[in-house]
Amino acid sequence: MSLVGISLVLVVLLTTLLAGGVWIGVALLATGWAGMQFAPGGIPAGSVLATKVWGNSASWELAALPLFIWMGEILYRTKLSEEMFRGLAPWLNRIPGRLLHVNVLACGIFGSVSGSSAATCATVAKIALPELKKRGYDDMVSLGSLAGAGTLGILIPPSITMVVYAVQANVSIIQVFLAGFLPGLVVMVLYSGYIVAWSLANPQRTPPADPPMSFREKLRESGKLIPLMLLIVLVFLSLLMGWATATECAAWGVLGSLAIAWWHGSLTWPSFWTSVMGAMRVNCMIMLILAGASYMSTSMAYTGVPQALATWVGHFNLSPYALIAALTVMYVALGTALDGISMIVLTTAVVIPMIKAAGFDLVWFGIFVVLVVEMAEVSPPVGFNLFVLQTMSGKDSNTVARASLPFFFLLVLAVAIITVFPDIVMVLPRMAFPA
């Protein structure tokens, strides 16, 4: 059978399994098994399956994944969202948009220790939505800023999505982590800039400022954020200075999260075991997907489909910018049907050869992928952040999707910025790992 025929058979099989509700990991394993039947030389599919699943699961780099997930689960069950709102609100009261900026900053802070977009969105929305509604803030901007800012959970390290990409693309997790810091700040500035512009254009829809507080009172309100800020600085410096590997940083992050939960009085045996079980469920799901993706990628490599596809795309002589534009459209389309991790594991084996041929750095491409995954998080019908806010606000899905639309286009702008100015992404990895 020709490579085109093999590709069609595998795509139809995978699509059928996913449409039938089969678990993504199982669908990938089944498609990989089918792909091995087309491999030349009679390579035993069972032996390759055992080798790839074990090799993928026993990776030292992947040991960071359950730890980062657990760290986010621990903090998700603390009073952190309440303390962040109270601690940040007094400092932002005089900026146009006022407390709407708390959504952006709080999501940025929590995202830097949670690694999950949905957890970040849910944690901040839990306290922010009632407070903003009570003060009379516009529902659409409140929902949109939470949907958009919630995506910072996977852009500002540590990030579960970044770990998955780094393992799939065989690049340094630490370098991908470091590459995400400045783009994360750029996205936060874009979000806050939009809120300022909207507020200035709609002053009648912005509530009056809260009564002013003295500097001493502001410090007292922000005091409980100090342990969290110290944890963020410690993780960042450990990565930048090379004091610890990503897995070691994750372990220290778990200990720091437990300490913060104890500090807030939220660490009980029930909450501890709930966080353990929550992290275990998420990790098992992701590990099964990664095992299936690894097996399917190997089977596709044996058939020669990715290399042939990369060669075919190369015949179009696309410029680097045109290739990135085409990939952006492809990922946005995939994001309407798949979650971010599934998008990464399904496309990495095919896309990486094209990216290498175009001369892009794989660390830079990792941040590009994270940004387009963020777009998927706020794209109907399967955007996780939209589901979270729909549940927490009681609004219908169309309303939440419309509210998030301006922030979707801000993410498109962020992709354009890092494409034109790639040093925004690469400066920290180059500082930490000079050539």
Question: Predicted segment positions?
Answer:
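Alpha-helical transmembrane segments of multi-pass membrane transport proteins
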Residues: 1-435
